[in-house]
A protein has these predicted regions:
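N-terminal and secondary-structure boundary signal
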Residues: 2-248
Length: 248
């Protein structure tokens, strides 16, 4: 059985210099290395805010030499304005019909939403979306899921938003698209702050590492170990920054 993700708990809540964070405890990786994790709470980040300023405000007071920062992809999307609003997306005939056949899960609407499906069509083209839909329908008969996203490619699986059940009203009207230069963004943030950075798109189902600065002292597998229980939390917890502190 894998590690079960959990929400931040009140008994884990701490505060330092006005910064609220949650002590997510120690986790041991497959290689025996251990990591302390701190989930740092922020305000709801708006489009165009500075990622450097956010790190200096929320992360700097808790940072120790040797720590690694897991920076949430949704916040990075907001900072670099990698977003689309409903007004910018016009669902056509195919989007208005195909969305009914898409799946849905508790972390988001998947493609079960015409605006989101139209955004994918705009990104990768209708022929690829139709091919992906056919492949997905066939493979689902054999219990294979996720083929639609693999065939579409181009980071389609990282699109979030247009989700009317979100706790945040802004996400009802806006979609976030993972940036296509994650390594560069991490390198620039390290250059500006001196803190090694990993860009993570995490939820309770998976933890996708989008990029990292070259100064991160952990392997990709060790990063996955440190984030295995999704210490960022799920939904409305507003803890997109995770300080990973290697202990041995």
């Amino acid at each position: 059985m894998g590690i079960i993700p959990s929400r931040n708990l009140e008994e884990q809540r701490r505060e330092k210099d006005g910064i609220v964070y949650f002590d997510r405890g120690v986790i041991e990786g497959k290689d025996g290395r251990k990591y302390q994790r701190y989930a740092i709470q922020t305000h709801f980040v708006q489009v165009g805010e500075s990622q450097k300023d956010l790190v200096e405000k929320y992360v700097r007071p808790l940072y120790q030499e040797g720590d690694i920062l897991s920076f949430g992809a949704k916040v990075m999307c907001m900072c670099v304005k990698s977003v689309k609003t409903r007004d910018e997306v016009k669902p056509g005939w195919w989007a208005n019909h195909l969305w009914r056949f898409a799946g849905i899960n508790h972390t988001g609407v998947g493609m079960h939403e015409p605006y989101k499906l139209q955004l994918v069509i705009d990104m990768v083209g209708l022929p690829r979306v139709l091919l992906a839909a056919v492949c997905s329908a066939v493979t689902k008969l054999f219990g294979v899921h996720g083929v639609f996203y693999k065939v579409c490619g181009k980071g389609v699986g990282g699109i979030d938003g247009f989700y009317t059940r979100s706790s945040f009203e802004l996400y009802h009207q806006m979609a976030l698209i993972n940036p296509d230069n994650p390594d560069e963004l991490c390198a620039k943030l390290y250059q500006d702050t001196g803190i090694p950075v990993v860009l993570m798109d995490a939820n309770d189902l998976q933890r996708d590492q989008l990029g990292k600065s070259s100064t991160v002292p952990l392997t990709d597998e060790q990063i996955q170990d440190a984030m295995a229980d999704n210490p960022s939390g799920q939904g409305d917890e507003l803890t997109p920054f995770i300080l990973i502190r290697p202990l041995n």
